[in-house]
From Swiss-Prot:
The gene is hse1. Component of the ESCRT-0 complex composed of hse1 and sst4. GO terms for cellular component: cytoplasm; cytosol; endosome membrane; ESCRT-0 complex; fungal-type vacuole membrane; Golgi apparatus; nucleus; prospore membrane. Residues 164-183 form the UIM domain. PANTHER family: JAK PATHWAY SIGNAL TRANSDUCTION ADAPTOR MOLECULE (PTHR45929:SF3). This is Class E vacuolar protein-sorting machinery protein hse1. The lineage of its organism: Eukaryota, Fungi, Dikarya, Ascomycota, Taphrinomycotina. It comes from Schizosaccharomyces pombe (strain 972 / ATCC 24843) (Fission yeast). Pfam families: GAT, SH3_1, VHS. It is a peripheral membrane protein. Belongs to the STAM family. Its main location: membrane. Residues 180-213 are annotated as: Disordered. Gene3D superfamilies: 1.20.5.1940, 1.25.40.90, SH3 Domains.
Amino acid sequence: MFRGKPNSIETLILQATDEKNTKEKWDVIMDACDQLSSTSGDVGRNSIKFLNKRLDTANANIQLLALTLTDAIVKNCKTSIVREISSRTFTDSLLKIASDSTTHNRVRSRIAVLVNEWAEIMKKDPNMSLMQDICEKIRKLDIVDLRAPKKPEKEAMNELELKREEEELQYALALSLSESTAQSNKVENPQSTKDEPLQKTNQRQESNLATSPASTVSRVRALYDFAATEQGELSFKKGDIILVLESVYKDWWKGSCKNAVGIFPVNYVQRVVEPTIEQQRQSAHMEQQVFDALPQIDELLDTLSTTSPDAADDDALQGKYHAMIALRPKLVRLIEKYASQKEELMDLNERLLVARRDYEKLYEQSMSEMRNF
């Protein structure tokens, strides 16, 4: 009736999928992959069954971490272990979770994307055909669009389009200046402007990129992976943030991503919508709520460290616990927000260092030529 003590691999699975994890523990994940690849017989099979149980839970964080671990297993473990991932039991679990409308949208989307990748990896092995079948069924659920669009042709911009690009740039600069002035006035008169400017800003931000000049867009987010096939193209992964520099062709823009510069197709990205003033206010309020709760968290930890197990049913203690647990989604969103900002700032720092290095090199060359005269 009761399971025995978890084996070493199951312990690693528990550590890698712990609901308290705020990010993937890749050292634990790769250790689990190494140990799985060195097993034989029922140990590996039972470990995958244990992973399946972690996946089949109501906790979205555990599910996402279990999917990350599963992805690492598919891409790093030996064939006999990967075949366990494509077993009837495991694939049925994936389909059940993806089909359940009560499953968190991030989990459903993650399953759809990963199953599509796994089906591609396993398609050459007839013993893993179940993953192909499940992939087709999940595609029909239409959770996410997995089909990357066709790359557009590199058509040169005509004079009319170049003129429009310049006009839009001047308009964007003037609009930015007027909004800056309006924002200064709003600080002095907070009741003078409200919903209308925000609605106009949102409408402008959400316009179709296909008809938007690059001069009106500062940042975009990748919707699909894009692998450069020609010199000068910019490779990126889905979710990457790209700084838009200029239009090069009709449907291709030049941009910078992770210290690389190149052109990319506009239909592979979407505009990064900047938060409105109201959204910024709400975000700041949520962040303050989390920091204001720090003393309560410390108080709960102190209480738990000195309370006997018999007090677990205490209503006051349970109330404090559930109040703190309710903060976790907000905390996770804040972590994601600042992780993204950190990545963008590090990318910006790298580009500034390159620019500084190039400038200093150019300056030294110039000074050297002057000294030779």
